[in-house]
Design a protein with these regions (language model features):
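Cyclophilin-like peptidyl-prolyl cis-trans isomerases
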Residues: 20-265
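Sec-dependent N-terminal signal peptides
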Residues: 1-25
Length: 265
């Protein structure tokens, strides 16, 4: 069984579970709760009509069209180890609009390098935002394609020191309760979640305030305890989500922009 990406703190301090249920966990694991004391309330999502007011992430050429397949290089996870630029940007074109993640390699070099390679080979194209907990986090990063998910199942990277706090808009890897289990799953903080800093969640990038207007609009009305099973997303891909959770928003494309996009691929 694939390892569900989540985080746990002691019950006495308030439990935070990061991930979705698997069949084995449904009877004993309570649904994830948004933090009460440590996280500030995030602004409510603006109505969909506000999407028209979203800023363009860049004035350059339009985003590439979504691919119907995947880059075969993604099947060789161990070979994708290019070093990321010191700073680079990734444009996410989604079913709600566009937002840009600015990555600072100095914050978390290992995580930044992994993200750079994933985006360079279009790993996140067509993937869904499968877990959205209001005023807490937005989680994504399971491939839309089962062969790709299988190739990255054990491609974990080492943990890194937390150099930045998990503030609203900051982007961080999901992981299990075990050390060194970061892989491809990402979350965006919807609030200031400083409690995650102590658990070793090290941000590597940030979405600016304008981009967060789009992130705030991602569909969040599926209850946390009735959301999709991560194992099944990995095994069955996007059709599993489209059938059971058709209102989930998804990523059309996630591409490097600016100087990073101009580097040889």
């Amino acid at each position: 069984m694939k390892r569900v990406k989540w985080f746990v703190t002691a019950v006495a301090m308030g439990t935070l579970l990061f991930g979705c249920k698997t069949k084995e966990q449904t009877a004993e694991t309570p649904p994830p709760e948004q933090p009460k004391a440590e996280a500030t309330a995030a602004p409510k999502a603006e109505p969909p009509a506000a999407a028209a007011a979203q800023p363009e992430a860049t004035a350059s050429a339009p985003a590439p069209a979504p691919r119907s397949g995947y880059d075969r290089a993604l099947l060789r996870a161990a070979l994708l180890k290019d070093k990321a630029p010191d700073t680079f940007q990734v444009k996410f074109t989604t079913t709600r609009g566009d937002f840009v993640v600015t990555v600072h390699r100095a914050w978390a070099p290992i995580g930044a390098d992994r993200f750079y390679n994933l985006v360079k080979h279009r790993f996140y194209d067509n993937a869904s935002f499968f877990r959205v907990v209001p005023a807490f986090i937005v989680q994504f990063g399971i491939s839309a394609y089962p062969p790709v998910s299988a190739a990255w199942e054990k491609a974990d990277i080492q943990d890194e020191p937390v150099t930045q706090s998990n503030k609203r808009g900051y982007v961080t890897y999901a992981k299990t309760s075990m050390p060194n289990t970061r892989s491809t799953q990402i979350f965006i903080n919807l609030a200031d979640n400083a409690g995650l800093d102590r658990q070793g969640f090290s941000p590597f990038g940030v979405v600016d305030a304008q981009g967060m207007k789009v992130v705030d609009m991602l569909y969040d009305q599926y209850a946390s305890n009735s959301g999709p099973d991560q194992d099944q997303i990995s095994k069955l891909g996007k059709p599993y989500l489209d059938k059971g959770w058709p209102k989930l928003d998804s990523i059309k494309t996630a591409t490097l922009i600016g100087l990073a996009a101009a580097k040889p691929q």
